Amino acid sequence: MMRRKSNLVTRTLNRKLPLLAALTVIVSAGFSISLPAQTTPYFRDKDFNTWLKTDNPVSLGITTMPNAGQTSLNAKTLSGDFHKAMESGRVNAWGFDSYGSKSLKPLNLWGRFNFSQERHQDRCWSDNIRPYNGNPYLTGSSVKGNYSYQLFDFSVRMSSKQLFDFMWIGIGLDYSLGDFSRLQDPRSRTQEIVYTIKPGVAFRFGKEKIGLNLSYGYSKEKIGSYVSKSKDSKEYLLYLQEGLGVYSILVSNAYDRRIESWKAGAALQYEHSFGSNSVLLGELSPFYRKDSVEDAYGATPGNYKEAGGRFFLAFRSGNWRSESFFSFKTGSAEKITQKSVTVTDPSSGVTSTRYETIFSIKSYTAEKLSAETGLSYVVKDTALPWGSKWNAGCKVWFNSDNDEYVYYSPVSSFARDNIVPYFYGGGTVLATKGHFLMIDGEFAYRVNLSDNYSISDELRDKVILDNVISPDREIMTSDFLKVSATFRYVFPLPATSSGRRLSGFTSLSASMCFVPGLNGSGRNLIGVSVGILH
């Protein structure tokens, strides 16, 4: 059995946790977990501060946030067989979540700190934490197993208040550490570190505002695999994917892979005010990403590059909200062939191995286009600090994907188009003596518009095609209905020793997915949370 290397996450936390804790106290944000299905901010800030929908951290300075926060304990369970081949069959999770905003004399601050602990069941084919992020270079076993996933996630935003009566400056920082470990042979361990920094500025010229922010991000995913109990490790194989069913096989014995990713971007914002309660805001944000894949001893099977952009437009007039966005990205992977070279240092006699590239060629391309437009009506009552009086809206989302493995002739390709109409609404149904009951719901139906699928005759071995690509195609092109609802109850707590009154809350969220074309298929999510509003 191979002794594990020291835990990157633990060592990094020991160095960074004091700083994270200090910043968290400053912005009134404690411990937390991110549970997407039930993260319902008690202030609907984005409905009334349109700049919060942009990527610019000066959004905190343009409109001052309330001195408030939320701390909660959350749990969720996700189950059902309507999921992609490299996703987990079942996920049980719990954690803490705390975030808050604070207005100081020169600055407006916002911060969030999350911790989550997840148990994944029946997962196979990929030990990558996010196997569907575009990069085709994936690693995994065909043997289903259970995984443990820990995530520490920290975010902070700082913005000046208005300077010289015409400008704001701000900065944002995101930092996370993840540990994704398989609990059975072949035992893989994936460790990830991600950080992003976003400086921003905005200027006011009468009824116009112009903003600009830059973004730089770095991440590193390190995957290791070994066999601990079997005497014959050759019975465990790793499948190293290259895109659309192409793969190679490696015995799972002391395997290592590192994927480093760099992402740079910018965002330009423009706002025009038509009056005290009518605003038009647009944002254009291009980006570029590069992934470098490296195996043991510096061998490189390939790399992945991606570029794209997003245009966002929001209009607010009174209680009406209209939002639209259009985004696109194109990615390509290179297949690299190398040879090993053994070098001996003449003075020390030490022998080392390095890899030299013989040739490289484009092997895989991916194109993605998404668009959405929607209209909503939101009624806010200042007597209801924990939500809107009521809201209703609809939107339509369109998505088009086209993946090709161009190393083969003819090429392998998979293209699909989907459209999803949404209808949602909710509000406060009870508000009396500090007690509030809020209900929100959503109804969505995905319709597949087209499905073009072609596999090259050059693909001889079809293990990944039959077990990953074809099942994923069925999931990605199936029509389905999704219904979700959230119930949230807020109640007063006894006054503190300083006389300050806080509120507690509890919430229940549920989401159900029904697939008419696949008998018995579905995906269900149930989540609960209990916490304090402060």
PLM regions with names:
Residues 102-104, 160-162, 201-205, 270-274, ...:
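Residue-level signature of outer-membrane beta-barrel architecture
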Residues 87-94, 146-163, 168, 190-191, ...:
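Outer-membrane beta-barrel transmembrane strands
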Residues 34-123, 135:
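N-terminal, post-signal peptide beta-strand-biased segments of exported outer-membrane/organellar beta-barrel
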Residues 83-89, 121-129, 138-148, 184-190, ...:
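Extracellular/periplasm-exposed beta-strand and loop segments of Gram-negative cell-envelope proteins
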Residues 75-81, 115-119, 162, 175-179, ...:
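Transmembrane beta-strands of outer-membrane beta-barrel pores
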Residues 522-534:
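Outer-membrane beta-barrel "beta-signal"
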Residues 67-71, 105-111, 165-169, 206-210, ...:
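Outer-envelope beta-barrel architecture signal
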Residues 159-183, 194-198, 279-296, 389-399:
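Surface-exposed extracellular loop regions of Gram-negative outer-membrane beta-barrel proteins
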